Amino acid sequence: MAKKVTAVIKLALQAGKANPAPPVGPALGQHGVNIMAFCKEYNARTQDKAGFVIPVEISVFEDRSFTFITKTPPASVLITKAAGIEKGSGESAKGSVGSIKRSQLEEIAKTKLPDLNCTSIESAMRIIEGTARNMGVAITD
């Protein structure tokens, strides 16, 4: 019989920089998970993606063992890196803070496709384009 999942924890951590300090320690500690084992495994899996925030979904089982799935970086992080800006606009309707080319948009959509709720690259591009528009980032051809 399969082990029973007692909790699912979702965190967004810097790639390769997980440590027992908050938010990791308290989130895992309350479920009795070995925090250092998680940190070492997470850092090993994400060391090649340094500089990105990588969301992780941790499944904790009855016997306090765990498994985790790393996701792709948030679209907003990928857009800010592509546009070369620090952060998105607070008032996106009034003006743009940067721009990205349609080819960059397609690359971001291809990266995010496994985590998005769509099957075609065109629909993924529309989702990412909407995120960019809300951040005040213009799309150029």
Swiss-Prot record:
PTM summary: One or more lysine residues are methylated.
Keyword Metal-binding: no
GO molecular function: large ribosomal subunit rRNA binding; structural constituent of ribosome
GO biological process: translation
Keywords: Methylation, Ribonucleoprotein, Ribosomal protein, RNA-binding, rRNA-binding
SUPFAM superfamilies associated with the record: Ribosomal L11/L12e N-terminal domain, Ribosomal protein L11, C-terminal domain
GO cellular component terms attached to this protein's record: cytosolic large ribosomal subunit
Taxonomy, superkingdom: Bacteria
NCBIfam families noted in UniProt: L11_bact
Subunit description: Part of the ribosomal stalk of the 50S ribosomal subunit. Interacts with L10 and the large rRNA to form the base of the stalk. L10 forms an elongated spine to which L12 dimers bind in a sequential fashion forming a multimeric L10(L12)X complex.
PANTHER family registered for this protein in UniProt: 60S RIBOSOMAL PROTEIN L12, LARGE RIBOSOMAL SUBUNIT PROTEIN UL11M
Family the entry assigns: Belongs to the universal ribosomal protein uL11 family.
Biological function: Forms part of the ribosomal stalk which helps the ribosome interact with GTP-bound translation factors.
Protein known as: Large ribosomal subunit protein uL11
Biological source species: Synechococcus sp. (strain WH7803)
Upper lineage: Bacteria, Bacillati, Cyanobacteriota, Cyanophyceae, Synechococcales
Gene that this sequence comes from: rplK
